[in-house]
Every structure is written in C-alpha cells, then in structure tokens.
Amino acid sequence: MVSTKGRYALRVMLDLAEHADEGFIPLKDIALRQEVSKKYLEIIVRDLVGGKLIRGSSGKGGGYRLCRRPQDYTVGEIIELTEGTLAPIACLAADAGNCPRKDRCKTLPFWHEFDTMVHDFFYSRRLSDLLSAQADEPATKK
C-alpha cells in the first residue's frame, strides 16, 4: 500500500510539473494548492531533493523545481524513493539476501508474478502521463 507520504510526493511532483515554466516554486504555494501542511511537505521535498528528483533554492525567488522534464520521471521512481521497495514480500526486495526457502517455496512464483505486475504498472507510467490525464478530465460542476 502506498502511504500518504508517497501520494503527497507524487502530488508535489505533479504540481512542480504543472508550474515548471514559473521557475522555482515556493513550498508555501505548493502546500496551498495541494491543501497539505507545509511542515509535512518539508519532509517530503527533503527526500525528493536527496534523491535528485527536484532541486531546491533558498532566499528570494527560491523554492523547488524539477531536475528533468516530466516525461523523464517514472511514477515508480518517485514512489520507491519515498516509500522504499514496492516488493510485496521481503525476499523479493532488491536488498534482500538469498532466501533459504527459495528453491522449495511454492508461493514464490505467485509473489514474483504479482511483484512484476506492480513494478510494470508503476514504472510504465510517467509524470507526463499523469499531467495528460489531468488535462483530459472534464471540468467538474459545483
């Protein structure tokens, strides 16, 4: 399951992509648009900067911006950076050691298939795909 942190990280990335032509975007502006606490977003952007997905600038005119074009980010890399592995079981995680039951585990093929589906789902979608889907949505009536 993707936590709030992962979902908000994706929203921050989308917000930065939508406002990419405005230069560095102040975190307070993102927080207002996304209706998320600025304090919580500070934790998330720290991870995104550390993972080299976004760049930060302090001072007047400072804020955050994408390091790459929206089409150069996968949803999977954003989610995994903030959530950790997407593997459904520990023995399929990239940093897992050799499982002693690997050769006789009857459920491993099932979990491996599920892991492949999840990985392919997240890594086949790009930030630009989410922007396009958002633009295609009809306006909601109030």
What feature does the model see in each segment?
Residues 32, 49-50:
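Alpha-helical residues within the helix-turn-helix
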Residues 50-53, 81:
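Residue cluster at the C-terminal edge of the helix-turn-helix DNA-binding motif
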Residues 63-80:
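Charged, amphipathic alpha-helical coiled-coil/dimerization segments
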Residues 75, 93-142:
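C-terminal regulatory/oligomerization modules of transcriptional regulators
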